[in-house]
Amino acid sequence: KHFPQGTAAPETAVPAVPELPDAADLPAFSIDDAETSEIDDALSVQDLPGGGKRVGIHIAVPTLAIAENSPIETIIKQRQSTAYYPGGKITMLPDNWIQTFSLDEGKRPVLSLYVEVGEDFQVASTPQTRLENLTIKHNLRIQDIEPHFNADTGLSENEPVQFPCQPQLRWLYRFAVERQKQRDRYEENRTPQYDYG
């Protein structure tokens, strides 16, 4: 009775996305649960010539195609967000919009934020943002990588690589640990945190 017209958002035509420059060839990847159908963010880690890394955070941008007072804007105002419940969800966007803008493997429009990080794990540049087309190389799934990348295994460079982008994840893990240490927030033997969401 709460959804007399059903829970699916009505299919609405997706306008042409504005022309965007192509990003550099980056090893961009996403990490999500196996059930995730709306992949809205991705990461990249690129080696810099003088040492250090350039870290990219890439966000899906369906707003590129949302015009004021358009049918899709009306749907979004009605729904406001994706609603999650145990065992399922009601998406804010229609399926054809999700398929167009989800960061599945392949070339996708994104809003990217780039920052350079030195070998000492200090942020070495002012963040830069760009609207661009980025080729997502890998959609990693937590259930697939967790057995090979956790507190007990997979973090050392001396261990074999078990899945795509594991070297980049190892570096991001070290970066996170070093930043926590620099902020006096690192807990080596932290009590496990559980997410029941």
Regions found by a protein language model. Give the residues of each.
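Electropositive polyanion-binding surfaces
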Residues: 9-197
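Boundary/activation segment at the start of structured domains
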Residues: 1-3
